[in-house]
Amino acid sequence: MNRFGTRLVGATATSSPPPKARSNENLDKIDMSLDDIIKLNRKEGKKQNFPRLNRRLLQQSGAQQFRMRVRWGIQQNSGFGKTSLNRRGRVMPGKRRPNGVITGLAARKTTGIRKGISPMNRPPLSDKNIEQYFPVLKRKANLLRQNEGQRKPVAVLKRPSQLSRKNNIPANFTRSGNKLNHQKDTRQATFLFRRGLKVQAQLNTEQLLDDVVAKRTRQWRTSTTNGGILTVSIDNPGAVQCPVTQKPRLTRTAVPSFLTKREQSDVKKVPKGVPLQFDINSVGKQTGMTLNERFGILKEQRATLTYNKGGSRFVTVG
């Protein structure tokens, strides 16, 4: 019993620190400032929470050390720009980004430029050194050259510089150059005419006449029906063709129709109305009869006429 009791007393004595040491620590903390006390408490807390690493842990492989660090929440090599270890313990290359992460278009621009050379000392761009500084531009230039070599030459209509505009005309949609130029001239004329400038149209009447003749002449046509009728059109050069009259271009605005004076016709138009069979003025002058009395007499005469004829379909209501 005594041995067992002595053992217990020894165990308790070794496990708990002496009270004198604790009192000394408390006295030291009283003399210290508040910031120093906070720092000291943090250090003590870190020492208590930090796991004790044995030699066995140091002899473990990289994967086992990685698992232990994940379990205990230890971050090793957490400094900026240091080489970090992956799961198998191999060194991973770290990127130094002191000014923050550069993404997007700025990252593309900076990757092509050589580091360490200021733009003042950099030689001017040429075909030789463009690949060193801007490899992306070099690739684009090569692709453009390949595409230009593969393209076929397309016939381009020559037009005056003033009227040259971008027209999205498909390749298979062919039109005569004369028509295009004529349309351009008319557009230009209307543009200037709206701003009060006089325009003299220069039209090739002979060319327009040739175009009209070419439209009228048709080639041989065979009907698609089952009948045996053949339609043929033959040119007759002896026939007189009516010359195409060109309307002169107006240099002033046309007068609207409602402002023009209408020509007064000599023939008087008979007004539409009901024939009264007598002159109202003469009746009023000759007799003292009113219009109501006169119309009443006419109604009675009409009623007697219809009654004498016999039966009629119409009935007059007085």
UniProtKB/Swiss-Prot annotation:
Q: Where in the cell is it found?
A: Nucleus, Nucleoplasm; Nucleus speckle
* UniProt keyword terms in alphabetical order: Acetylation, Isopeptide bond, mRNA transport, Nucleus, Phosphoprotein, RNA-binding, Transport, Ubl conjugation
N-acetylmethionine occurs at: M1
Per the record, its GO cellular-component terms are: cytosol; nuclear speck; nucleolus; nucleoplasm
Glycyl lysine isopeptide (Lys-Gly) (interchain with G-Cter in SUMO2) cross-link position in this chain?
K261
Q: Which GO terms describe its molecular function?
A: mRNA binding; RNA binding
User: Where expressed (tissue)?
Assistant: Expressed in a wide variety of cancer types.
Annotated region Disordered: the residues are 1-25, 79-100
**The motif UAP56-binding motif: which residues?**
26-44
Task: Tell me the domain of life.
Answer: Eukaryota
Tell me a GO biological process for this protein: mRNA export from nucleus
Residues annotated with Phosphoserine modification: S16, S23, S61, S118
> At which residues is the cross-link Glycyl lysine isopeptide (Lys-Gly) (interchain with G-Cter in SUMO1) found?
K140
Basic residues: compositionally biased ranges: 85-98
- Which Pfam family is one of this chain's hits? FYTT
Instruction: Identify its protein family.
Output: Belongs to the UIF family.
Q: How does it assemble?
A: Interacts with CHTOP. Interacts with DDX39B/UAP56 and NXF1; interaction with DDX39B/UAP56 and NXF1 are mutually exclusive. Interacts with SSRP1; required for its recruitment to mRNAs.
Q: What is this protein called?
A: UAP56-interacting factor
Organism encoding this protein:
Homo sapiens (Human)
